[in-house]
From Swiss-Prot:
Keywords: 4Fe-4S, ATP-binding, Bacteriochlorophyll biosynthesis, Chlorophyll biosynthesis, Iron, Iron-sulfur, Metal-binding, Nucleotide-binding, Oxidoreductase, Photosynthesis. Binds 1 [4Fe-4S] cluster per heterodimer. The cluster is bound at the heterodimer interface by residues from both subunits. Pathway: Porphyrin-containing compound metabolism; bacteriochlorophyll biosynthesis (light-independent). InterPro entries: LIPOR_BchN/ChlN, Nase/OxRdtase_comp1, Protochl_reductN. SUPFAM superfamilies: Helical backbone' metal receptor. The gene is bchN. The keyword Acyltransferase does not apply. Its cofactor is [4Fe-4S] cluster. This is Light-independent protochlorophyllide reductase subunit N. Protochlorophyllide reductase is composed of three subunits; BchL, BchN and BchB. Forms a heterotetramer of two BchB and two BchN subunits. Pfam families: Oxidored_nitro. [4Fe-4S] cluster binds at C29, C54, C115. It catalyses: chlorophyllide a + oxidized 2[4Fe-4S]-[ferredoxin] + 2 ADP + 2 phosphate = protochlorophyllide a + reduced 2[4Fe-4S]-[ferredoxin] + 2 ATP + 2 H2O.
Length: 428
């Protein structure tokens, strides 16, 4: 069976030399991942051990007032804690006791490290073990770091899921595990497609509730739905699970190849695959063509932000007719992103890490039609006449799989259309 996809480029970017940048950074810290994780994991609570700045970041980013009692909060480190004049561990134990007494619905508690807790070397791993022993088995306490010293934007989710993997029950069952947090409606679409293909059981990490936690073992195969899960990938591999490598499910091509890799693993026939995917593929292709009309022939420059950049560059160049000038990403995990890099035609600079001033110099020299960057860089670049796209929108907006393919293309085409309208109005 032919998948009716464009042929791969004669030479991809998997072996392209990577420009390593190690300078000033401009990116959100890993605490930001709590915003989508607390909505996904419905019996979990995320307790950040940090400063008032951490609390303000979370409250502002989530758009949730504290009196609404969301499933996250901050244990604020005061000056006496930072100065070593108080027993931070004893105070943390008291705060956790009060929290669990007030919120008996909590089954998973995450102690999340921040810049202040890292600076004073507060051992949250040991604290989590101590609190798990005290409050278990009703409540399991985990810990991970969302510190800006150690993590960037999307690494918070990776650190969270990696902390869960060692505690997952062992199983010998042959199961497919989908790894990465997705909006519920998108996750349902993915599971529905896989079920129609006859693949199952399908389990998800993270699960909605602790009682639904998947097992993992030597017969577990897993597919990542987010490209920033390097630590989670390693943790699952150490438990004996095997990764199904594939391009990520962005756009019609990425979704089809992602599904095809899983279908091949489970022996799905070509006829069944075609019958299940033909209609949604056609819808996705039509939607992308309509939404990307203003993108064809234009150039794009990715500044590092979320680790989605190589996959999105593949989508824009292969399905939307754009050319990539530079694809910057905080970390480049070739074992995970290799299939996407194979489909990204050689030519663009691949950069890993960040040196803001050097990268901005390259943006100014290249004059791309669209620059994908963080919030802090967008307005200054717009003031210089560049068209920008906020990278954070690509994480917070549903963009995976067939039904969201047109929306994904639209996220990139809207700023280009807006700039064109403003230029016409200025000319008049």
């Amino acid at each position: 069976m032919s998948l009716d996809l464009p042929p791969p480029p004669a030479r991809g970017c998997r072996s392209t030399e990577v420009l390593k940048e190690r300078g000033q950074r401009e990116v959100f810290c890993g605490l930001t991942g709590i915003i989508w994780l607390h909505r996904k994991m419905q019996d979990a609570f995320f307790l950040v051990v940090g400063s008032r700045t951490c609390a303000h970041l979370l409250q502002s980013a989530a758009g949730v007032m504290i009196f609404a009692e969301p499933r996250f909060g901050t244990a604020v480190l005061e000056e006496k804690d930072l100065a070593g004049l108080a027993d931070a561990n004893a105070e943390l134990d008291r705060e956790v006791d009060r929290l669990l007494a007030r919120r008996p619905d909590i089954r998973q508690l995450f102690l999340v490290g921040s810049c202040p807790s890292e600076v004073i070397k507060l051992d949250l791993h040991r604290a989590a073990e101590r609190l798990s022993a005290h409050h278990g088995p009703a409540v399991r306490v985990y810990n991970f770091s969302g510190s800006g010293i150690e993590t960037t934007f999307t690494q918070g989710e990776d650190a969270c899921l990696a902390s869960i993997v060692p505690t997952l029950p062992a199983t010998e069952a042959r199961e497919l595990l989908l790894v990465g947090a997705l909006p519920d409606v998108v996750e349902d679409q993915a599971v529905s497609l896989l079920t129609q293909l006859g693949i199952g059981p399908v389990r998800c990490l993270p699960a909605h509730h602790a009682a639904e936690a998947p097992g993992v073992g030597p017969n577990t195969v897993f597919a990542l739905v987010q490209p920033f899960l390097g630590d989670t990938h390693g943790a699952l591999t150490r438990r004996g699970a095997r990764h199904i490598a594939a391009p990520f499910p962005f756009g019609e091509e990425g979704t089809t190849l992602w599904l095809k890799a899983i279908a091949d693993e489970f022996g799905v026939s070509a006829e069944t695959f075609e019958a299940v995917t033909a209609a949604p593929r056609a819808r996705a292709r039509k939607a992308v063509a309509a939404a990307s009309e203003g993108l064809r022939g234009k150039s794009v420059f990715f500044l590092p932000d979320s680790q989605l950049e190589p996959s999105l560059a593949r989508f824009l160049t292969r399905e939307c007719g754009m050319s990539a000038v530079e694809v910057g990403t905080p970390f480049l995990h070739r074992g995970i992103l290799g299939p996407d890099l194979d489909l990204l035609a050689e030519g663009p600079v691949l950069s890993e890490g960040q040196d803001v001033e050097r990268q901005l110099d390259r943006v100014r020299a290249a004059r791309p039609d669209l620059t994908v960057c963080g919030l802090g860089l967008a307005n200054p670049l717009e003031a210089e006449g560049f068209t920008t796209k906020w990278a954070i929108e690509l994480v917070f907006t549903p963009v995976h799989f067939y039904e969201q393919a047109g929306d994904l293309a639209g996220l990139f085409s809207r700023p280009v259309r807006r700039r064109a309208i403003l230029r016409r109005e200025a000319a008049e």
